[in-house]
Amino acid sequence: MATKKITLVIPDAGPLISLATGNALDLLLALRPGVRLVLTDFVYFEVTVFQDRFLDGAQIADFVKKHQAAIEIVPTSIGEFAIPGIQEKPRNNPNVPWPNDLGELSISSFVTTSKDFNPGEPTLVLIEDDWFTSHAYAVPGNVHLLSTSAFLDGLEAQGVIESAALIRSAIQSKRPGFKIDFVVDKEAQKIPEGTSWRESFSRDKRAT
């Protein structure tokens, strides 16, 4: 039985920052026709709110603006609730709570509420820490979890990039906390056929 190919890609904040740091955001656009790239409102807010202070935030904002026809920014209940309060006072104000898991929760919320059928369309969520793997209850059954490092390895195997190691090295040189050895490639748990993501990316579709 053939596995279900991914039709929706949603990166968390960590992968966006790392790919920006490694000048590799364009890899997210190497998608075959019919595959959507989505950012939740809170993840986008989280990575760009201080774009005037951090180069990666400015890079992400410019990237999204340049490719707005190919990137969807979707509203979520998390973003609707949290963003206005944070905008009123800076994040570095200790009196303003900013839980670390709001981005992940916004992704989980979007995937869960946007389903037209069960278990839902095969969805790839790019991650960079163990929040999703440690909170299985928050992972919708149609979600395939993939870490940044595993993503780069897969793109190399698919011929989209020449060297995953070079991009990882570029990321780590500017982002020492990047976890090169955090490798996760976990299929969706409630799609009986299983899920695959590599075929959803093509070397011919990479942006320039």
Residue ranges and their predicted role:
Residues 1-11, 19-69, 93-105, 109-122, ...:
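Feature 3881 marks metal-assisted phosphotransfer/nuclease machinery
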Residues 125-126:
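Conserved SAM-binding loop
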